[in-house]
Amino acid sequence: MNEPPNSAGDEIQLPRGERVDQLRHLIETLRIADEVANRGYLITSAEVAELMDINPGAVTSRGDHWPWRNWVISRVRREGNQILWQLEKVD
C-alpha cells in the first residue's frame, strides 16, 4: 500500500533557493525581535502577530506572559484600545 505524498512525518522539499530565502527571512525576523528586546520597545498585539506570523487574535489568547523562541513576551499595559507587549531575551 502506497502512502500519499506529504503524509504525516514527511517534509515538503523546496528548491534550495527557496529554503535559503526562508532562512534569510527567519534570521531577519529574529534580528528584529532581538532589537525590539534590546531597546526595550513596546509593540502592539498586531506587531507581535506579524513578528510571529500568527493571527492577531492568537496573541491575546496566549495570556499575559509566554515564551516564544529565545524571548518571553509579556503584556505591559493598555493604551486606548491597544495592548502593548515587551520582549525579553532569555538564555
Task: For the regions a language model picked out, list residue spans one by one.
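Major-groove DNA-recognition helix of helix-turn-helix-type DNA-binding domains
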Residues: 56-87
